[in-house]
Structure formats: structure tokens, C-alpha cells
């Protein structure tokens, strides 16, 4: 089922909008984490058009510079490696869409006693088009490794990007590059981390020209790759998937994806009879670039949050009513959402939403005020 181009809005949740910043040129990623170990979720903002990496301190959203002189930043991941309560930050920078011009530096940033002051930047690797970083508990011990998913292979060229793209990881300490897989071809845009089979070990889902793929480490440290879904069935390079998230409706797991690369579709996958069935629930996005799942109402059913960068620049929320997915507009034209993060930002027990805009240069958070009362609909 595909929603019409302008589906009827169904207001399910209420929000209060807050603007934090309006000068983040090329806003690309927002990460929610407790940067200063005070129990409140702060926001780290990465803007590819800036050379400063900044964070905003909850609750007043005071701005702090983590590090300067970091050109062409593209992605970060935060995790407390040493157990001092303050996360280290893995950062990919010196990025270019042209693989032969992309240095692909990966650095680890660590505070120097006060997270509000300058952090130390230590380079650990150079891998062309390093594009997505995530901390992953592959061993099931709570000690995470850093996964690096480059966008393309080193010799890839637009528009087909026909080259093998590596997927690698690093263990804190030696930071040696280790191969997960280097046989997949094309472009990989997004990865997400999940304990796919409930064994206490994290797995990796990737979204790219080859669709949605699952990477799982097996005995002896060998990695296995399996295809979950092919994504958009169009011909290469319009095929596959761009970003993927995992959600649940009760006990049932589903996947939500932006498709194809930077695409116009929100697709939902449900494993009916063990086979993942694709349903396009919206085909009206323009340059779709972010997708997340979150239980906004606390009812055990996850909503989907999706945003797109092209005009008319909107962020949508999709809620499942038992028969179909209904759409609500969270932001109409106020942010060209390159990324959204979900976290409880005001400590009221409800998850909120934060988004960063590329062309709009802004950072907003949307305070979750709870579901709309039935009498208001």
C-alpha cells in the first residue's frame, strides 16, 4: 500500500518546538548523550560546513566547542571507553563524495578533565569515504568496538559506484583496522546496530545499493553477511536502500527504511511467514535522509520518524493503528532534516525528538507533550 502524494494528516501526538541554534552551516548529524556526566542528555551537533564540532548543554543549551579545525566532518559516535562517565567521541572527517579526493580521517576525541573545554584529537585511521561510525558490542561483554562504514570503495565513481566497499572495525587500545567484509559492491549509506537474534551480541544492519544486509560475527571471529531485503527494485543505481531503523509493535519486529539512496520513499518491512514483505507507506519525500523509530506514547508500539532535506523540507511521524500507517507532520518547512535523534531531553519520562537541518542551518528539539486526547481528534 502506498499513501497518496498528499495523505490526510492524522494528529496523534502533541509537541512543543524549541530552536537551539540557527548558524550550523551544513548541519548533518545530531547525537544525544550525556556529555558532562550530570544525568541530563546533551546534544552534539556536527555541521559539515563548519570546522568546529560543538555540543549544547542541557537544560539551558549553552554552546561549547569540542574541537576546532576539523574540515568536512561527516559522522560521529559517542561512547564512554574508559568508564569515567564522559564519552569519547569517534569522528569521521576530511570526507568527499569523490572517493579519490576523500582522505577519510577517523579520529578519537577525548576530554581533558573538563568537557566544556577543548578536547584532544587523536587520529587512528585514514580510509577513503569514511562515512558512518557506530559503537558496537560484538562480543556481548559491554565493551564496544568502533565500526566504520565508508560510503563507497576507494576507486568508485558516480553514478554507478561500481567498486567493492569495505566495512571495518577497530578495538579500543590498538585501534588496528580489522575487516568485517570487503566483498559488497556499490554504495552503503546507512548502518544501524541491533541485537538481531537476542543473543546478547550486537549485529550490524547496512542500507545501500544492495538493499538491507545483516552482518553477524560467528565462531572464531568470522563475519557472516546475509540479505534481509533488496529494497527498491529499480535498476542500479536507483536500487536498494538508504537508511534503516528497527522498531517493534508489541512483540513483532519491523524495519523502517528510506529508499532508495536519498530517496522519496518510506518503506516498512514485516516478516510475514518468515519472509520480509515490503510496504511503501509514503512516496512523497524529497531527498530523504533520516529515519528513526521510537515509542512516543509509551504504549508498546513504535512510531517512525522520517525527515527529508529537499523542499518542502518536512519531518513526519508515522503511527500504526492496527491496519495502516497514519502520518503526522512534526515540522512543515522549518528544517531540512539531515538527521534526527530521539531521547528524553527534559527528564519527564517521554522520548523527545531533536533534528538538525542542512540547508536551514538549524538545530531544534521537539518536546513530547503526550498523545492527543480522543476528544481533541
Predicted regions and their residues:
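Beta-propeller-forming repeat regions
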Residues: 1-377
Amino acid at each position: 500500500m502506498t499513501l497518496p502524494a498528499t495523505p490526510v494528516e492524522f494528529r496523534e501526538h502533541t509537541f512543543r518546538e524549541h530552536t537551539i541554534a540557527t548558524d550550523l552551516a551544513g548541519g548533518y548529524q545530531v547525537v544525544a548523550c550525556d556529555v558532562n556526566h550530570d544525568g541530563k542528555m546533551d546534544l552534539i551537533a556536527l555541521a559539515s560546513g563548519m570546522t568546529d564540532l560543538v555540543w549544547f548543554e542541557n537544560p539551558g543549551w549553552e554552546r561549547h566547542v569540542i574541537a576546532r579545525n576539523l574540515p568536512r566532518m561527516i559522522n560521529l559516535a559517542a561512547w564512554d571507553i574508559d568508564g569515567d562517565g564522559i564519552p569519547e567521541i569517534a569522528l569521521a572527517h576530511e570526507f568527499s563524495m569523490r572517493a579519490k579526493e576523500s582522505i577519510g580521517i577517523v579520529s578519537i576525541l577525548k576530554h581533558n578533565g573538563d568537557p566544556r573545554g577543548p578536547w584532544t584529537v587523536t587520529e587512528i585511521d585514514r580510509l577513503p569515504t569514511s562515512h558512518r561510525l557506530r559503537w558496537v558490542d560484538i562480543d556481548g561483554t559491554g565493551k564496544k568496538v568502533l565500526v566504520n562504514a565508508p560510503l563507497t570503495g576507494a576507486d568508485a565513481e558516480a553514478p554507478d559506484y561500481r567498486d567493492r566497499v569495505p566495512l571495518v572495525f577497530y578495538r579500543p587500545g590498538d585501534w588496528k583496522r580489522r575487516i568485517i567484509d570487503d566483498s559488497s559492491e556499490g554504495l552503503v549509506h546507512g548502518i544501524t546496530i541491533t541485537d538481531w537474534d537476542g543473543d546478547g551480541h550486537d549485529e550490524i544492519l547496512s542500507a545501500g545499493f544492495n538493499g538491507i544486509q545483516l552482518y553477524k560475527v560467528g565462531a572464531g571471529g568470522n563475519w557472516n553477511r546475509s540479505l534481509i531485503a533488496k529494497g527498491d527494485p529499480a535498476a542500479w543505481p536507483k536500487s536498494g536502500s538508504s537508511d534503516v531503523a528497527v522498531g517493534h509493535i508489541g512483540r513483532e519486529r519491523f524495519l523502517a527504511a528510506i529508499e532508495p539512496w536519498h530517496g522519496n520513499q518510506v518503506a516498512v518491512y514485516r516478516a510475514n511467514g518468515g519472509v520480509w514483505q515490503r510496504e511503501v507507506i509514503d512516496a512523497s519525500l524529497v531527498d530523504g535522509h533520516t529515519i528513526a523509530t521510537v515509542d512516543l506514547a509509551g504504549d508498546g508500539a513504535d512510531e517512525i520518524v522520517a525527515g527529508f532535506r529537499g523542499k518542502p523540507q518536512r519531518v513526519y511521524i508515522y503511527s500504526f493503528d492496527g491496519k495502516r500507517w497514519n502520518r503526522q507532520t512534526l515540522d512543515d518547512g522549518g528544517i531540512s532534516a539531515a538527521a534526527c535523534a530521539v531521547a528524553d531531553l527534559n527528564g519527564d519520562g517521554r522520548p523527545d525528538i531533536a533534528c538538525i537541518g542542512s540547508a536551514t542551518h538549524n538545530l531544534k528539539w521537539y518536546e513530547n507533550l503526550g498523545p492527543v486526547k480522543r476528544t481533541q481528534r
